[in-house]
Regions:
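Terminal-region recognition feature
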Residues: 1-165
Length: 165
């Protein structure tokens, strides 16, 4: 997936916007912006006695993309002392849906669309390569399902039903 540089940041307002494929470039930029804002909050927290961290607002309008890049941003959000609120402004699909779920608080608009689906990939290679790829896909799929169950009211049965469609 190629990034079209549709990720925006207004660090003065602590507002970020993901309107691109979830890939190394777009997630790298967002992660950097978030980490910078967290660092600034950490410094203020040390200097000011009653410093109150204002939330970072992450607006999402993305079809998704790379599951590996997705996890990098999710871990930063989940481990942030600064609250990060996610907003779906149109659609949060696939990897973008899981990023949305990471928000400390989550908001969506009336016409927002979400999509969760089973993982897909295209592989070729020698037999052993394919066996190892299958094991990796099984592990990633399990990790994804557990995360969605943990962050939503969906049950394992709900996830299984979605996956079988």
């Amino acid at each position: 997936m190629s990034s079209k540089d549709n990720s925006y940041a207004n660090t003065d307002k602590k507002t970020l916007f993901l309107s691109d494929d979830v890939d190394n470039e777009s997630i790298g930029k967002l992660t950097w912006s978030i980490l910078q804002q967290i660092r600034e909050d950490d410094e203020k927290d040390e200097k000011e006695k009653n410093y109150k961290r204002e939330p970072i607002k992450l607006y999402i309008n993305s079809y998704g993309g790379s599951v590996y890049d997705m996890w990098g941003l999710i871990d930063v959000i989940l481990n942030s002392k600064t609250p990060i609120y996610t907003y779906c402004t149109g659609y949060a699909m696939s990897a973008a849906f899981k990023i949305f779920l990471a928000g400390h608080k989550r908001y969506c608009y009336k016409h927002s669309t979400f999509m969760y689906h089973q993982m897909s990939c295209w592989r070729s290679g020698k037999y052993q390569d394919l066996v190892e790829d299958r094991e990796e896909m099984d592990w990633l799929n399990k990790k994804n399902e557990e995360y969605v169950i943990d962050r939503t009211n969906l049950t394992k049965d709900d996830i299984d039903e979605i996956r079988e469609k």
